[in-house]
């Protein structure tokens, strides 16, 4: 009960009220369970205990208005722009923000997957806007942002989620195309969206940029050379943007997960499913929903609170 409810400071929760409930509870318990009769069964005791906790929670642990504001009202009709939304963490974010009442701009290259996601969401048609967008294409990003319908142009939360990894080659044997794809998506794509969205946030004195980094931006691993470099860049860009926005109410957060079971490894190994499966052998990885929960938590703090960085990993990873 205490873990789920905040004590409400109203006349309901007085010492007298608490005492009355407690005395009634003990009277009932003593009359049923401390007399040498057949009344004191486990079932009877359980019923009394449940009744007791119901009385206590209704009188002394009612949810506060602030709690309801955070979960039910704060996100209502906030415009949330999610890149890489067609699968994985992006799709999980779409689900949790839709459930909270947000309006969603979902962007990805795979149009059919976006449509499938939209169909699966319990959300009104006027609260979702789909964009087929390659974040690596700066001119396409510029045109997309500048030509959003007026009712969608005031973006409140930007989730820079689009990203990928390619290969595990040694640096001196690396594939140039793989390097360029990682740099263009993970760094340039994030920069393009940030550059075209954040000025509006500053002008409106409201907004939140959430960049999806990685534990790879904090520690390198064999074969991760360029990918780790791109995620280290995301970490530095997030810190630099936060400094640039000091004096404004616009917030910046970097969420840096460890192993997450998505299509990430399949993409890394160019569709080699068997090789991708081996990445998670002996490990219970994070799920996209695990990461989306953390992102949603960061986005729903009080406006004066900025969570700069979150590192989350599965218990099986160190």
Cite the ranges covered by each PLM segment.
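Active-site helix of classical SDR
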Residues: 194, 230
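Residue(s) in the substrate-gating loop at a strand-loop-helix junction
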Residues: 214
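The beta1-alpha1 cofactor-binding region of Rossmann-like NAD(H)/NADP(H)-dependent oxidoreductases
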Residues: 132-143, 176
């Amino acid at each position: 009960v205490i873990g789920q409810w905040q004590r409400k400071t109203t006349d309901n929760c007085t010492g007298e009220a608490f005492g009355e409930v407690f005395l009634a509870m003990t009277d009932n318990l003593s009359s049923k369970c401390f007399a040498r009769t057949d009344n004191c069964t486990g079932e009877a005791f359980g019923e009394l205990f449940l009744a007791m906790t119901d009385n206590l929670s209704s009188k002394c642990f009612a949810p506060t208005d602030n709690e309801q504001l955070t979960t039910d009202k704060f996100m209502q009709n906030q415009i949330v722009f999610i890149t890489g939304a067609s699968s994985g963490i992006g799709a999980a974010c779409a689900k949790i923000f839709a459930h909270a009442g947000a309006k969603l701009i979902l962007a990805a290259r795979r149009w059919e997957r976006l449509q499938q996601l939209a169909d699966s969401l319990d959300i009104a048609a006027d609260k979702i806007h789909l964009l087929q967008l390659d974040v690596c294409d700066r001119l396409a990003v510029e045109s997309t942002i500048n030509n959003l319908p007026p009712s969608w142009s005031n973006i409140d939360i930007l989730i820079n989620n689009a990203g990928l990894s390619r290969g595990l080659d040694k640096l001196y044997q690396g594939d140039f195309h793989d390097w360029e794809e990682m740099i263009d998506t993970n760094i340039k794509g994030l920069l393009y969206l940030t550059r075209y969205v954040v000025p509006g946030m500053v002008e409106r004195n409201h907004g939140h940029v959430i960049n999806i980094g990685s534990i790879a931006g904090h520690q390198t691993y064999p074969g991760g050379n360029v990918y780790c470099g791109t995620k280290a860049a995301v970490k530095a860009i997030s810190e630099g943007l936060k400094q640039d926005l000091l004096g404004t109410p616009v917030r910046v957060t970097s969420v840096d997960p460890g192993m997450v079971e998505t299509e990430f490894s399949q993409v890394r190994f160019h569709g080699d499913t068997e090789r991708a499966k081996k990445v998670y052998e002996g490990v219970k990885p994070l799920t996209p929903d695990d990461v989306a929960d953390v992102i949603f938590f960061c986005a729903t703090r009080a406006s004066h609170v900025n969570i700069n960085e979150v590192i989350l990993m599965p218990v099986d990873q160190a």
